Amino acid sequence: MSSSQNDIPEPVFVGGSARSGTHAIGRLLGSHPNDLQLPIESRFHCGTGGLTDLLNGNTDIDAYRERCLGKWWQRGLRQHLGLKRLIERDDLEAALERLRAGLDDDPLQAGSRFVREILDPLAERAGKPVWVDLSGANIRQAPTLLKLFPRARFIHMVRDGRAVTAAILKKRDMTDDLAQAFGHWEMRVRRSDAALRQMPPDAVLTIYLDDLTAHDREAQFARIVDYLRMDDPAPMRAYFDETISPERAHVGAWRERMAPADARWVDRRYRRLVRQLRREGIDWVPEPGGQ
């Protein structure tokens, strides 16, 4: 990135539908010496009932505090994820009290300071000026996050809805309901589009997973480098060449990842939905093509 640390765009928020490649691009960015991929999706800043909802009046500080110290403190099948990976509990409680105290005077400043109290020390200990968060709701909450972090960058990961559906069905801790899996993709698309319409031009970089991994690798890699103002992308380039591949992303393999009847159902629904979304002006979803 830029040799002047003040010119480095930070932080970086990556978001999109579940199973759309957010973690793949997070690891790619984390291979750069300046970028720390956070060890978890932090969620506390953008999830439902999170900090952005607090700042927008959709929840209150007591309910938010309870979430931070409760369901967001530890989560996952083995309860190994959550804020406990990022901060000591006593430090989190103290930061929450400072957030409470600052909300009346300057809520945006208080919110930004709260996020930085939790996440900046991780990057500082790693000797990196930028942290990268992969919470799925980052794009949905991008308009508020941009107010908190005016120098932030947002990467919107997009993937064919049929491939997302197949990947969700394969994920043990998500769902095995076909309609629910497909509905998740549609919901995320609509919510993301509503947020994107509120963002300034060129504030968000949209990356199609299939293009990044298979169809347009060089151009997509260059777009990421330019967007993040990277002076020396060589370490990231090495990771990209060695690790980012069509095979790992299961490009074009969604039919093989579900039962034939389910694949036909998803294909029909996807083609109809893409036409409907186009009519609504949502023109960034991948075309079904001949797949």
Model-derived features with residue positions:
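Anion-recognition interface
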Residues: 58-60, 64-91, 134, 139-145, ...
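PAPS-dependent sulfotransferases, especially Golgi type II membrane carbohydrate sulfotransferases
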Residues: 1-13, 108-109, 169-172, 193-197, ...
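Amphipathic alpha-helical recognition patches that constitute DNA-binding helices
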Residues: 13, 24, 153, 208, ...
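A generic secondary-structure signal for well-formed alpha-helical elements
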Residues: 32-39, 228-232
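A conserved segment at the C-terminal end of the G1
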Residues: 23-35
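P-loop (Walker A) phosphate-binding loop of NTP-binding proteins
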Residues: 17
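PAPS-dependent sulfation machinery
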Residues: 39-131
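PAPS-dependent sulfotransferase catalytic domain
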Residues: 97-235, 257
